[in-house]
């Protein structure tokens, strides 16, 4: 099935409970780089957070902790750690409990980063499904972010997710729909 990228400046809103098909969601979601001041509605935010809660984690440890930041004071603190909020009125800081993660056989990897990534991915796709624009932000020092926000010492920050509605005229970057051929990224053994 061919996936058609919709030529829009922002994601279609979820009006009347009509949802996009999953392939449309993944094809049309893009990293928004400038937001209007319109706040994300509570019911849409709840749907986004619920998608993260339903994400699978190693051994179902559910070591994630998502911080919702909306106040001007806390957004200003985030702005001291990363320049990549792009004016989003809501951000999610996705962290995980480093004392409650699964250590894989061999002891070289733990599940916290992977599990938090799965959770964040569920939430970012749920945002697109709700018609909410987003940006995955990892341009910051995780330790400084945790310290700035006063997070518990056992929690490690994975990423920041900008949420909101694109400012007028803002859309995907020119390279958004450029993808390598499947043959370049997949090998059958």
Regions found by a protein language model. Give the residues of each.
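Acidic, surface-exposed loops and disordered segments
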Residues: 2-189
